[in-house]
């Protein structure tokens, strides 16, 4: 699973998300889901950097990690995962956070 570090992933701004589900419907890998509050959440191991979710979000709540503003990256809860990560996935995730300058802890 360490190969996950090669993927860029997306930033999901929970403050902007309107719970429309367009991102969930657009993702060919089923890498997004709506959480218990109706907000978009990334399923890390399914994401393959297709970025369909970025293109269809009507309020621009989703962006590529490399293009997200520092303010968006610093918000608590901007990246959300559907399940706990394995130790290998956690290591890959930490490498990804370092690569893209991520500072906020997960919720």
UniProtKB/Swiss-Prot annotation:
Which Pfam families does the annotation name? Answer: Fer4_10
Q: Which PROSITE patterns does this entry report, sorted A to Z?
A: 4FE4S_FER_1 (PS00198), 4FE4S_FER_2 (PS51379)
Q: Where does [3Fe-4S] cluster bind?
A: 27, 47, 53
Miscellaneous information on this protein: Has a maximum absorption at about 282 nm.
Q: Residue ranges of the 4Fe-4S ferredoxin-type domain?
A: 8-37, 38-67
Name of this chain's protein? Ferredoxin
Q: Which organism is it from?
A: Pyrobaculum islandicum (strain DSM 4184 / JCM 9189 / GEO3)
How is the co-factor bound, per the entry?
Binds 1 [4Fe-4S] cluster.
The UniProt PTM text for this protein says: The N-terminus is blocked.
Q: How does it assemble?
A: Monomer.
InterPro entries, A to Z: 4Fe4S_Fe-S-bd, 4Fe4S_Fe_S_CS, Fe-S_Ferredoxin
Q: Which cofactor does it need?
A: [4Fe-4S] cluster; [3Fe-4S] cluster
Write out the function statement from the record. Answer: Ferredoxins are iron-sulfur proteins that transfer electrons in a wide variety of metabolic reactions.
PANTHER family the UniProt entry points to = ADENYLYLSULFATE REDUCTASE, BETA SUBUNIT, L-ASPARTATE SEMIALDEHYDE SULFURTRANSFERASE IRON-SULFUR SUBUNIT
Name any one GO molecular function: 4 iron, 4 sulfur cluster binding
Q: Does the keyword Electron transport apply?
A: yes
Q: Which residues bind [4Fe-4S] cluster?
A: 17, 20, 23, 57
Keywords in alphabetical order, please: 3Fe-4S, 4Fe-4S, Electron transport, Iron, Iron-sulfur, Metal-binding, Repeat, Transport
